[in-house]
Amino acid sequence: MQLATMIASPNSRRFRVAGVIAALALVALILHLRLRWQPAPFEYAHEYYQSVRSYFKGSVYNNTLYTDGNDMVDPYFNSSAPCANFPNTDGVLLVMKTGATEAFDRMPTHLLTTLSCLPDFLLFSDMEQQIGPYHIFDALAEFEESAKAHNDDFDLYRNQKECPVSQKSCIDAKSEGHKAWNLDKYKFLPMMEQTWRMRPNHDWYIFAEADTYIFWANMIHWLKKQSGFDPREKLYLGSRSFIGGTPFAHGGSGYILSGTLLRHLIEYHPGVVKQYNVKGSNECCGDLMLAMALEEYESVKVRQAWPMINGEKPSTLPYGPGHWCEPLLTMHHMNSEEISSVWQFEQTRKVDRILMIRDVYEGLIQPKMQVSRANWDNLSDDVCYINPDPEAQDRAEGHFRDRQKKQEDMNDVEKEAWKSWENCAKVCASQDEPDDKSSNEKKRSRTCFQYRWHEEVCCTAKSFKLGAPKPAPGDSSSKAKWMSGWHLKGINEWIDAMGECKEPAWKKAEL
């Protein structure tokens, strides 16, 4: 009996073990809380970030757009839910056009960014191709053989089909660029026909190039709420350009057709595609031919949606008057790295409002602005000052000569501006008020924000742009140097004087 009482039952042993574990857990909790109560070291935020990473399905990275003083974006890029804030695109279809010589350079970035959030889209090219699970349709597959047979514009089309390896190996995109351009114009009308056949009855059709970026949140808000347009009407929207007096929506900037207009064009006029295929050899551009067909058959002209539908990219946008509080719907000439950067900016922006041109400047361009850059072209060309010597005048490009300020209208600083980049830099500074206490109205009316100097030509600009690098000159003479500079004081004063954009400056797309 005594022995029996000395031997504990299995249940009692389990209770004792559980008690010991509970006690140890309590001690561990107290130690943990005590450490948390202590002042957090500088590395605490990083340690906390590391501890929560496992809770995200995707990865969290340092945001490469984040810099000291740039409070537009979050310091971390959480890629676990890239489509969480993507708008509802029901009734809207994207149709993107590319070329076989560029598809594998341009399309993958689109597919990894904005296109990854679209439930459906169509891709067209001048050759049928496959990128992973995504199919690219040949817009010219049904083009009449008789129209192609004796047309040199189709030499590239035939060469691409005969290439037994990758297009990169057979076709030099740089040297064959003009051939790709000549071939491209034939895709527009056949693409309309195939789009309607494959994806009929959408409210809106957005057509874009492989170097076009679309701000989808802005675009859907504008089409469905802000514009006031009814897709049951025949509508053609874009950034208007002119050739020979004919207005058309610039293809690279992107353009929009209402479903009603596309249906009418294709279903009511079955011969339009064939007719314009023949016309193509005598016209320069496919976007022009589309506009001609819409006017001829539907009596519809393009409605101007610029600068919202825009032909520039962040580094070439002319920030300033007319390009500030306006929302952006598209941008053009975007390479893959730029597309990725703008997507990243949209993903990591701290604010959830309509994205305006000002936001692009403050988030992507302002952190890179500095007083001057050598071997750089910031695209200043609004007002020019050129060496008055006849030989120098002949040497200068006609575009710059046409924008010279008259000698009798120049002040003393401007008369010396062509002599050196240092002199050129003084032109914008000469507009500053002596007491630096000018009114906001005066600051808002500033007309000189930056300069560019090269070969005794000094030009200033009424807006501010970042621009792009120029090769260092082989000529050792100082006048061959490219120099660009920004009057940061004037730029920042203008921005302060403008104040906050209280409301997005939506533009009414009018004829």
Can you describe what each PLM-predicted range is?
Residues 204, 212-292, 296, 309, ...:
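Conserved catalytic core of nucleotide-sugar-dependent glycosyltransferases
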Residues 89, 109-121:
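Short, acidic, metal-binding catalytic loop of nucleotide-sugar glycosyltransferases
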Residues 76-79, 102-114:
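Short, well-formed alpha-helical segments that are part of the catalytic scaffolds
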